[in-house]
Amino acid sequence: PSNIIAAGNRAMDEGYTHYGPSPGLTELRERIALEVSETRGISVTGDNVVVTPGAKPIMFFTMLALVDEGDEVLYPNPGFPIYESMINFAGGIPVPMKLLSSRNFSVNVDEVRSQITSKTKLMVINSPNNPCGSTINHKDIIALAELAKEYDLTVLTDDIYRRFLYEGDFHSVTSL
């Protein structure tokens, strides 16, 4: 498309012809921080943002940084297939949070609570969910956040599909 060609030419004319900074271009990081601040109701600066080539790498880096051999990781199932493979690669034990069709693929907070052990370290939240399209309501987002706090769990929230929510309200654990 002509606008992409023009943007590429403009970037070259402006000297963007070398590797950028490892965390990403400052202007992009600041714009992402503004977007997150506005959509989640939290204060984020460009210094809090790292740009990666897609969501998978940063989720993978997070798993590698936080999950040790034998740590349990709660993740939505059905869900993005890469969650389970990343947990396994990091040496963790995948613990599926079952999203059943009989519950419209919504999470059962009491069931999640029963799955938490002393080895549970991380909880993955994905809403809207891939591939089901289900969302976690505000009450359950709060309850999951409270569980994470009570059991000292880190939460990896995958909000990538929030722009594909066509009815209802988007709720993210980062807003709490």
Language-model features and meaning:
Residues 65-87:
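Conserved PLP-anchoring active-site segment centered on the Schiff-base-forming lysine
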Residues 56, 80, 127-131:
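Short glycine-rich anion-binding loops that position phosphate/pyrophosphate groups of nucleotides
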